[in-house]
C-alpha cells in the first residue's frame, strides 16, 4: 500500500449554535462601535485542521497516511483520537509554550457564521522537515499551514522528486505572484475550489489552460455542481445527491 504524507494543520474546532439571528442583535447604524455577546447553549468541540481532516478521510479508504504538523501543549486528546485511527504521528511536533491551532465558530439560525481562528503552533510548521521522513513517500499533500512551512515542504518535495498535491485552500491569499508560480512549477497536482481557482488565476496571472499545462492535473471542486479535472482533457464529475445536506464546518 502506498504512503501518503500530509503536511498541514491539526486544529480544534469549537462549534457553537446561536438560537437566534445575528441580524436581530447587530444594529447597522451602530456597527462602528460593535459590542455584542451571544448566548450559545450548544457547543461541540471537533477534531479538525487540514492535515487531520485529510488523514481521517484517507483512513476511511484504508490508505496509509503519514501526518506532518506542529501542535501545542494541549494536543493530548487529539493524539488519542489519531492513535485510535492508527494514523502515523511520528512527524507531529509539539511546540513548547504554544497551543494547538483552534477555530471558534458561531452559527445562527440562518447559517450565518462568525469565526475567530488562533493559528498557535501551526505557524511553526517550518520546524518540520520532509527530509526527516524515513518511510518511502509515494505522494505528498501540501495543505494550509504556516506560510514558511508550506514553501519549505513544497521545495523539499521538489528536491526529492516526491510528487505532491498543492492544496492551498484558505491559505491561498498568503502568497504573492512569484510564490504561487513557484508552487505551480513544483506541484504534480493542484486542488482548489471554484473561488480559489479564480484567485489563483488572478494572482499568478496564468489562465486555467496555462496552469493545467504545468501540472499533471488541475482539480476544481464546485460544491453542489460537482468537480472538474483538467488534464489532457476536461473531466466533469457530478456531485452525489444528498438526502439531508449538513453544514461541513469543522
Residue spans for each PLM region:
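Beta-strand->loop->alpha-helix junctions that form or flank phosphate-binding loops
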Residues: 68-73, 90-100, 216-222, 241
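Conserved phosphate-binding/catalytic loop of the ribokinase/pfkB sugar-kinase fold
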Residues: 90-95, 103-144, 148
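A short, aliphatic-rich alpha-helical micro-motif
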Residues: 134-135, 184, 212
Amino acid at each position: 500500500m502506498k504512503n501518503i504524507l500530509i503536511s498541514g494543520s491539526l486544529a480544534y474546532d469549537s462549534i457553537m449554535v446561536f438560537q437566534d439571528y445575528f441580524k436581530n442583535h447587530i444594529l447597522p447604524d451602530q456597527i462602528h462601535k460593535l459590542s455584542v455577546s451571544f448566548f450559545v447553549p450548544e457547543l461541540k468541540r471537533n477534531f479538525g485542521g487540514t492535515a487531520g481532516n485529510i488523514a481521517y478521510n484517507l483512513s476511511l479508504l484504508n490508505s496509509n497516511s503519514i501526518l506532518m504538523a506542529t501542535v501545542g501543549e494541549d494536543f493530548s486528546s487529539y493524539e488519542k483520537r489519531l492513535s485510535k485511527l492508527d494514523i502515523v504521528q511520528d512527524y507531529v511536533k509539539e511546540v513548547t509554550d504554544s497551543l494547538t491551532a483552534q477555530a471558534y465558530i458561531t452559527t445562527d439560525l440562518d447559517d450565518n457564521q462568525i469565526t475567530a481562528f488562533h493559528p498557535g503552533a501551526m505557524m511553526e510548521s517550518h520546524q518540520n522537515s520532509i527530509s526527516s521522513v524515513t518511510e518511502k513517500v509515494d505522494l505528498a499533500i501540501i495543505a494550509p499551514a504556516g506560510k514558511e512551512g508550506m514553501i519549505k515542504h513544497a521545495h523539499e518535495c521538489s528536491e526529492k522528486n516526491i510528487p505532491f498535491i498543492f492544496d492551498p485552500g484558505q491559505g491561498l491569499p498568503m502568497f504573492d505572484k512569484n510564490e504561487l508560480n513557484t508552487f505551480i512549477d513544483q506541484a504534480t497536482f493542484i486542488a482548489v475550489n471554484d473561488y480559489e481557482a479564480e484567485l489563483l488565476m488572478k494572482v499568478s496571472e496564468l489562465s486555467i489552460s496555462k496552469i493545467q499545462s504545468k501540472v499533471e492535473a488541475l482539480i476544481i471542486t464546485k460544491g453542489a455542481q460537482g468537480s472538474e479535472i483538467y488534464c489532457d482533457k476536461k473531466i466533469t464529475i457530478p456531485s452525489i445527491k444528498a438526502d439531508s445536506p449538513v453544514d461541513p464546518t469543522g
